[in-house]
Amino acid sequence: FNMESDSFEDFWKGEDLSNYSYSSTLPPFLLDAAPCEPESLEINKYFVVIIYALVFLLSLLGNSLVMLVILYSRVGRSVTDVYLLNLALADLLFALTLPIWAASKVNGWIFGTFLCKVVSLLKEVNFYSGILLLACISVDRYLAIVHATRTLTQKRYLVKFICLSIWGLSLLLALPVLLFRRTVYSSNVSPACYEDMGNNTANWRMLLRILPQSFGFIVPLLIMLFCYGFTLRTLFKAHMGQKHRAMRVIFAVVLIFLLCWLPYNLVLLADTLMRTQVIQETCERRNHIDRALDATEILGILHSCLNPLIYAFIGQKFRHGLLKILAIHGLISKDSLPKDSRPSFVGSSSGHTSTTL
C-alpha cells in the first residue's frame, strides 16, 4: 500500500511514449515516468485533504473508544477482543500519519528524509498489521462458531505471541520502505517522499508491489473467505437466536473489506504492469491510472475509520461496555444500564458458540 505524496509521471505533452528519450534532469529512479502534461488536480488535492481530515477525526474517535472499552473490560476479555485491541491500535497509528500526508498533497514533501522514512514505515507497518489482524479475527470466529470448542488460541500467552508475531512480520515487510525511501528533489517538481533504488528501481518496484498485494490483500482475503464461508454454512444449519444478526455482521465484514481494497489493488496491478512496460504507457492511460489510484486510495484509507463501525458499533456489547464506563464516571445513571450488559463486546470464543463480532 504505497501512498505516494506526489505523482511524477507527467511532465510534458505527448501521446506515444515508446520513442521518447527521458530527460536527464530527473532522478534515476524516475526515468520510467511518462512524459505527459498532468491534468489540473488542484480541486482534487484539496478534496483529498478534506477526506483525510475527516477520516483522521473519525478514526481517532472510533478507535480510541474501541480501545477504551476493551481495556476497561478486563474480566471476560475474549481472544477476539485482544485482536480488536491491536486492530484499533493499528488503525489509530495509521490515522495519526494522515495529517502529514494531507499536507504533502498540497505543498509536496517538506518534512525531510528522516520523517519521510519514519512516517512511511509507520504507515506500512500498521497497514500490514491491520490486514493480518482481520484475518486472525476471521480465524478466531471460524474456530469458535464452526468447531464450538475451546481453542488453543484461548491461552493468553499464545494470543500475545500471535499479536507480537503479526507486528514483527509487518515490520519485516515494511523494511524496504525504511531502507529506500527519502525526500526527492527535482527541477519543476515539488519535493516528494519516494523510493530511491538506483538503476534497479523498476525491478524493485515490481517486487515491492507484489509483496503488499500478496500479504496485504490476496492472502488475508482468501483466509477470510474460507473462514467466513464455513462460518456462514454453520450458521445456516444451526438454530441460533442471533443467527441472522451474525450473518449481517459477517457479510458486512467481507463486503466492506472488498469494497475498500479490491479496487485499489486492481488499479495498482495495472499501474505496476504499465511501469514495468508489460502494458504500453501512453499519456491518456497514465492520466486514467493516476485518477483511479487517487480515488481508490481514498477507499482504502476509509477502511481505517470503518473498522470500529463494523467490529464494534454494530454489536450491542460494545454499546453496553461504553455505557458502563459512562456510568462508572457518573456521566449517566446506572439504572439506564442494560441488565444483560457484559464486559466483552465481541463474545467469548471459549466454551460456547458466539455469533457476534
Swiss-Prot record:
Q: Which SUPFAM superfamilies match?
A: Family A G protein-coupled receptor-like
Highest rank taxon of the organism = Eukaryota
- Which InterPro entries has this protein been placed in? CCR1-9-like (IPR050119), Chemokine_CXCR2 (IPR000057), Chemokine_CXCR_1/2 (IPR000174), GPCR_Rhodpsn (IPR000276), GPCR_Rhodpsn_7TM (IPR017452)
Main subcellular location of this protein, as a coarse class = membrane
Keyword hit for Ribonucleoprotein: no
Pfam families found in the cross-reference section: 7tm_1 (PF00001)
Task: Give GO BP annotations, semicolon-separated.
Answer: calcium-mediated signaling; immune response; neutrophil chemotaxis; positive regulation of cytosolic calcium ion concentration
Q: Protein name, please?
A: C-X-C chemokine receptor type 2
